[in-house]
Amino acid sequence: MIKILIPTAKEMKVCQNIARPKLSAQTQIIIDYFSTLTVSDLEDIYRINTSAARCEAQRWQDFKCKQLTLNPAIKLFNGLMYRNIKRHNLSISEAQFMENSVFITSALYGIIPAMTLISPHRLDFNTKIKINNNSLKVFWRENYDTFMQSDDIMVSLLSNEFETVFSPKERQKLIHLNFIEDRDGQLKTHSTISKKARGKCLTAMMENNCQTLEHLKQLRFDGFCYDNELSDSKQLTFVKKQT
């Protein structure tokens, strides 16, 4: 079975569903820390203006009181990759794939199934804070490494920021996907190409119930197809020819 790891995104699209969620002990530790910080503290940590810091301070207080706006994680995050993922009007098989095979790597919640209900927040692994005297990456490392203790194929659509949360040993188990555009023989890639292609690739995997690497290599999506010569056992490269 394939499991696909995707990152969170800064951009969010919030729906109004108020509830009192269950939170893990590690998530609660982070909430307890942030809920003690002042608006000024948050301005410095996030490097944002006072108005934005007030918004984040209120979010952390809402977390503390457990009066939260909850959304399925896959629908809450709304960055470029997410906007290229099919997230609405899923068939039964697509919804099952999303629930069982797609996981989001979060600095607040850990690794969670894509349909997990979560609340809007601002936190990533580059945030300069110490939780229990550890960086967020070290704080979550054991949890992330535990997720890798299975025989499933782990496909990474993560950036380096998220992959380095895993210990080097567990990181070696990840299968990376690379997306390149061929423009008149010139191979090019950049963040916009990669983010859009990650979303399109995940959609194709979901629509085709992709469960093996051989099946993944056969997929065609948004003009991309697998290139064996540019790939190896740990990195699958997909190329899109542009005229």
From Swiss-Prot:
Pfam families: H2O2_YaaD (PF03883). One of its GO terms (biological process) is response to hydroperoxide. It comes from the Bacteria. One of its GO terms (cellular component) is cytosol. HAMAP family: UPF0246. Belongs to the UPF0246 family. This is UPF0246 protein SAK_2020.
